[in-house]
Amino acid sequence: MNFKISGHHLDITPPLREYVETKLERIVRHFDQVIGVSVLLSVDNHKEKDRRQYAEINLHLKGKDIFVEAHHEDLYAAIDALVDKLDRQVIRYKDRVQGHDREAVKYQMAAAQMQQ
């Protein structure tokens, strides 16, 4: 798995990198076909304080790319919200992919039973 983390107007410190990596382990545990991950953390000068810290992620899966973004006044809270959103999308995608495979097997078994 390729992992890239970058920051705009922000230095990526080792504790921040480790925090992001530990949060993303949850995603890999749910779905093991992750090809690459690119994370962008940014600090902007918005008038609204709750939108100053920005985090986005591009998750490259086998057959699909997922993009998620989150804003918050605390960068760690933005990362938490980002991973929660990403987790929901990955689980939904995994269910969709596995659901199609199960339906195909179910129809094949039903067709085989009808031929007998």
Curated annotation (Swiss-Prot):
GO terms for molecular function: ribosomal small subunit binding. GO terms for biological process: negative regulation of translational elongation. The keyword Endoplasmic reticulum does not apply. Keywords: Translation regulation. Disulfide bonds: none annotated. Pfam families: Ribosomal_S30AE (PF02482). The keyword Lyase does not apply. One of its GO terms (cellular component) is cytosolic small ribosomal subunit. It comes from the Bacteria. Signal peptide: none annotated. Associates exclusively with 100S ribosomes, which are dimers of 70S ribosomes. Belongs to the HPF/YfiA ribosome-associated protein family. Short HPF subfamily. During stationary phase, promotes and stabilizes dimerization of 70S ribosomes by the ribosome modulation factor (RMF), leading to the formation of inactive 100S ribosomes. This is Ribosome hibernation promoting factor. The gene is hpf.
